[in-house]
């Protein structure tokens, strides 16, 4: 049957540092990196991540064997590349529960055996089944839990292990290793001398007898090359942050990964027209408005918020329609851009003459910004040395108005805003903090400002209501759901909501399926479902049962599902394209669900697009779905055959997001016959009809 809310994961990572490397079969190299498994040759450049089935993003080992390519994650998950060269199959997860790291680059293979050096043991794995054969924790007189393996190597029929106590060796019968009952006997290992498991020259790089002197091959006058592979007239030179190819006397730097270059992402913000902007802690921003990421742009003079971005859970990136962007760098004021952040417009700096509060001379602290309710500019809350924070209004032409000292706390956290119910005033929510910490005690201030459009562009004389925080803690993120008239928020340890006409924050009574977590971020989708990011447990989608804010049912998403990293620093929902974006230290994840799109204007007089059907002709089973798009969320969709018989109907949750996706099967679960089919979309008095062709 048709799949409701078709799901699709994408991961974007920076594939560095390189932890291990091995030559590919004909050309190129396989690389184990902190951003996934990378394949790089003269033409192609792919990074494989959990979205391709890996279930982990940080890999410490890779081997290329006659049985295929195998990758080993930081904590010992083992996966094999599928024959289609597209996805991966996880063979073994058993080691990950031990939470012991693999020694980077120390994964070897012989016959049908993979040998993995962990920090406290050596593991032997059956390559065919992926099952662990056994692990040894002592070799000779060396306890590996005390003197862990540093390097391993296979030379002929012997396995060598180097520790801080020297190198030991053991002769192995790799074909009959399962029957080697003495493998666990430490006495079968012997100390050896004169064996070098890493004999590269640390001072120079030599290819075909020629010493290469190119600067990219050296760091501090020492060779940056850790692996060297000669492949049919080409030599690949690889280091932790280096990929180069030497061919016909010419060295080519292949290090840069063009598709995604934003490292240390900590914040994402959906673009109203569709897409996302991401910010990094080292002061760069990058946008994706469709199928690719733009090159990162420096936010301000090379400054970044650095660890403050993580420590204080900064939410300082906001985006208006038509590409206007505001960003705050810790201590450095506000920075306005247009063209999705690629055209700097104006800097509002703390050492200039303006009304911003400062916590120190020439030093501003802002933890949150948001879009003004009428989309005329941005709002922010600035901390003040006097212990009374202020609220700022910044227009797109860089005018700033400050309501100084309107809060009672030293520090202000995230900020959110909406129009009052009579559409005259602004309601502004500011999370208060007794200290800068994301774990601080605090509450929530609710301000009612007259719209600046009625006050000559100035933010003046607010009414303030202060309420107790959830469990007395400061909120670290907030999301306004105007359709359902509720504000959702998270503290580091809790989830709460406050209805617009209430004066207190409440906890949902039941959140079935949600484990205790440290929360980092929150957003609400067009259906009123709540999404929360966590510090270590991935993302949860909390569905309201029977429309209740108090009864929620959780769906949990982790790296097993396709998330790049279970440590989620921020989330934001693109309601135009139906995508939730998630920020991680090693990249960005996106997750498409058809029900994440906002569809309330579809099939109305203000709709920007008419109902459409694609692809036509439609080939069922060809890894695609027939889509009937731009329909009302209250619509009913019926599909008929040429004889007028009803084949399928869609209603309710099946049309959430304004799109029906049909796999080409009838009510009986079988493929429909080739031919002409008709669709009818009914939404109140509006009816849209059309036809399409099915072919096999």
Enumerate the language-model features and the residues they cover:
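Carboxylate-rich, polar loop motifs that coordinate divalent cations or form catalytic acidic clusters
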Residues: 1-610, 646
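C-terminal tail/sorting-segment detector
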Residues: 676-696
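Glycine-centered tight-turn motifs at strand-turn-strand junctions
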Residues: 646-672, 684-688
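Surface-exposed loops/turns
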Residues: 565, 620, 633, 656, ...
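Extracytoplasmic/periplasmic beta-strand context in beta-sandwich domains
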Residues: 389, 442, 624, 660, ...
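Short, glycine-anchored, charge-dense loop/turn motifs used at functional sites
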Residues: 636-647, 677-679
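Residue-level structural signal for beta-strand termini and adjacent loop
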Residues: 138, 257, 652-653, 677, ...
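Glycine-centered coil/turn sites that cap beta-strands in beta-rich domains
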Residues: 604-639, 650-652, 659-662
């Amino acid at each position: 049957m048709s799949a409701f809310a078709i799901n699709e994961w994408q991961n974007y990572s920076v594939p560095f540092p390189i932890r291990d490397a091995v030559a590919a079969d004909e050309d190129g190299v396989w690389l184990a990196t902190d951003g996934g498994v990378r394949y790089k040759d003269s033409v192609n450049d792919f990074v494989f991540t959990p979205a391709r089935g890996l279930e982990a993003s940080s890999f410490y080992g890779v081997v290329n064997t006659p049985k295929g390519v195998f990758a080993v994650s930081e904590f010992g998950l083992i996966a094999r590349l599928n024959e289609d060269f597209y996805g991966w199959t996880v063979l073994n997860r058993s080691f990950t529960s031990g939470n012991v790291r693999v020694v980077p680059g120390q994964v070897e293979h012989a016959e049908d055996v993979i040998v993995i050096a962990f920090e406290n043991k050596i593991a032997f794995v059956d390559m065919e089944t992926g099952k662990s054969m056994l692990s040894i924790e002592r070799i000779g007189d060396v306890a590996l839990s005390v003197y862990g393996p540093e390097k391993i190597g296979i030379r002929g029929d012997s396995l060598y292990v180097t520790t801080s106590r020297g190198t030991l060796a053991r002769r192995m019968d790799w074909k009959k290793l399962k029957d080697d009952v003495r493998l666990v006997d430490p006495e079968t290992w012997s100390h050896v001398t004169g064996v070098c498991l890493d004999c590269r020259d640390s001072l120079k790089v030599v290819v075909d007898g020629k010493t290469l002197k190119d600067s990219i091959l050296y760091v501090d006058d020492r060779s940056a090359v850790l692996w060297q592979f000669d492949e049919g007239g080409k030599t690949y030179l690889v280091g932790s942050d280096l990929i180069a190819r030497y061919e016909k006397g010419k060295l080519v730097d292949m290090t840069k990964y063009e598709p995604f270059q934003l490292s240390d992402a900590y914040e994402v913000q959906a673009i109203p027209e569709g897409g996302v902007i991401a910010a990094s802690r080292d002061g760069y921003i990058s946008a994706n408005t469709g199928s690719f990421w733009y090159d990162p742009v420096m936010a301000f003079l090379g400054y970044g918020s650095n660890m403050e971005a993580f420590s204080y859970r900064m939410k300082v990136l906001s985006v208006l329609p038509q590409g206007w962007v505001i960003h705050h760098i810790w201590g450095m004021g506000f920075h306005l851009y247009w063209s999705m952040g690629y055209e700097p417009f104006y800097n509002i700096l703390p050492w200039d003459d303006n009304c911003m509060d400062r916590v120190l001379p020439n030093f501003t602290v802002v933890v949150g910004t948001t879009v003004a309710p009428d989309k005329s500019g941005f709002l922010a809350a600035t901390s003040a040395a006097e212990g009374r924070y202020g609220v700022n209004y910044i227009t797109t032409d860089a005018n700033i108005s400050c309501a100084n000292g309107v809060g009672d706390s030293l520090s202000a956290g995230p900020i959110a805003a909406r129009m009052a119910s009579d559409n005259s005033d602004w309601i502004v929510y500011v999370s208060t903090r007794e200290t800068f910490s994301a774990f601080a005690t605090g509450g929530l201030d609710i301000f009612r400002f007259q719209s600046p459009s009625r006050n000559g562009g100035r933010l003046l004389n607010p009414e303030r209501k202060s309420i107790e925080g959830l469990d007395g803690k400061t909120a670290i993120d907030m999301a306004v759901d105007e359709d359902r008239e509720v504000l959702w928020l998270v503290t580091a340890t809790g989830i709460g909501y406050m209805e617009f006409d209430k004066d207190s924050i409440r906890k949902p009574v039941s959140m079935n399926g949600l484990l205790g977590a440290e929360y980092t971020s929150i957003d609400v989708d067009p259906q009123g479902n709540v999404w929360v990011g966590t510090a270590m447990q991935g993302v949860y989608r909390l569905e309201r049962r029977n429309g209740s804010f108090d009864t929620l049912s959780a769906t949990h998403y982790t790296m097993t599902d396709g998330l790049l990293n279970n440590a989620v620093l921020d989330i934001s929902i693109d309601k135009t394209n139906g995508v939730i974006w998630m920020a991680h230290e090693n990249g960005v994840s996106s997750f498409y669900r058809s029900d994440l799109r906002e569809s309330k204007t579809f099939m109305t007089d203000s709709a920007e697009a008419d109902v459409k059907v694609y692809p036509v002709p439609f080939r069922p089973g060809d890894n695609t779905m027939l889509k009937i798009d731009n329909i009302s969320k209250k619509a009913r969709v019926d599909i008929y055959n040429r004889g007028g018989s009803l084949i399928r109907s869609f209603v309710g949750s099946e049309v959430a997001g304004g799109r029906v996706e049909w796999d080409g099967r009838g009510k009986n679960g079988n493929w429909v016959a080739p031919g002409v089919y008709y669709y009818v979309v009914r939404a109140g008095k509006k009816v849209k009809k059309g036809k399409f062709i099915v072919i096999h």
